[in-house]
């Protein structure tokens, strides 16, 4: 059926090889940022640069309008082996980060929370401040600290 063919994404994968040696400058980087410079930050930065140069690779097709939507941000997921198994954190807004910012990314337990409120009384800033306080340090609310 031609309709199904047009509506179903045709995913493909391309693989290539590249030299990822990190040479020189690493002792200075470690001294300046108190971080070890790894291959992953170079890979993430290179990917972000390539996505900025070829924005169609970071685009999506809007299901409702069937239009191509070019994202103005770059989020990259990287699989990381941990003692608990494979974890795939999302590094958000990579295009705004430098190598040190990327090396500082750490896997932390995350949780989504929502708050329904009367927007006539509460602005988004206050709602988010409340939610972050409740999630990031629940001891404050639970233990009346």
UniProtKB/Swiss-Prot annotation:
Pathway assigned in UniProt: Amino-acid degradation; L-lysine degradation via saccharopine pathway; glutaryl-CoA from L-lysine: step 6/6; Carbohydrate metabolism; tricarboxylic acid cycle
PTM-bearing positions, type Phosphoserine: 14
Subcellular location: Mitochondrion matrix; Nucleus
Domain annotation Lipoyl-binding: ranges: 4-31
Cofactor detail note: Binds 1 lipoyl cofactor covalently.
Name assigned to this protein: Dihydrolipoyllysine-residue succinyltransferase component of 2-oxoglutarate dehydrogenase complex, mitochondrial
Gene Ontology molecular function: any one: dihydrolipoyllysine-residue succinyltransferase activity
Transmembrane residue ranges: none
Pfam family, one: 2-oxoacid_dh
Entry's EC annotation: 2.3.1.61
Statement: the UniProt record of this protein carries the keyword Calcium: no
Keyword Acetylation recorded: yes
UniProt catalytic activity: N(6)-[(R)-dihydrolipoyl]-L-lysyl-[protein] + succinyl-CoA = N(6)-[(R)-S(8)-succinyldihydrolipoyl]-L-lysyl-[protein] + CoA
UniProt keyword list: Acetylation, Acyltransferase, Lipoyl, Mitochondrion, Nucleus, Phosphoprotein, Transferase, Tricarboxylic acid cycle
Broad class of where this protein is predominantly found: mitochondrion
Record-listed N6-acetyllysine modification sites: 36, 66
EC class name: transferase
């Amino acid at each position: 059926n031609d309709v199904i063919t047009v509506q179903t994404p045709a995913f493909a994968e391309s693989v290539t090889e590249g030299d990822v040696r990190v040479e020189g400058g690493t002792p200075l980087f470690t001294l300046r940022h108190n971080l070890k410079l790894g291959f992953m930050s170079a890979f993430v930065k290179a990917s972000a640069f390539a996505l900025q140069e070829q924005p169609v690779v970071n685009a999506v097709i809007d299901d409702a309008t069937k239009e191509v939507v070019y994202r103005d941000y770059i989020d990259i997921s990287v699989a990381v082996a941990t003692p608990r198994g494979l974890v795939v954190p999302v590094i958000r807004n990579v295009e705004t980060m430098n190598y040190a910012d990327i090396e500082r990314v750490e896997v932390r337990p995350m949780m989504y929370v929502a708050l329904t409120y009367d927007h006539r009384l509460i602005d988004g800033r206050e709602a988010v401040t409340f939610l972050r306080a409740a999630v990031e340090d629940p001891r404050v609310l639970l233990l009346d600290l």
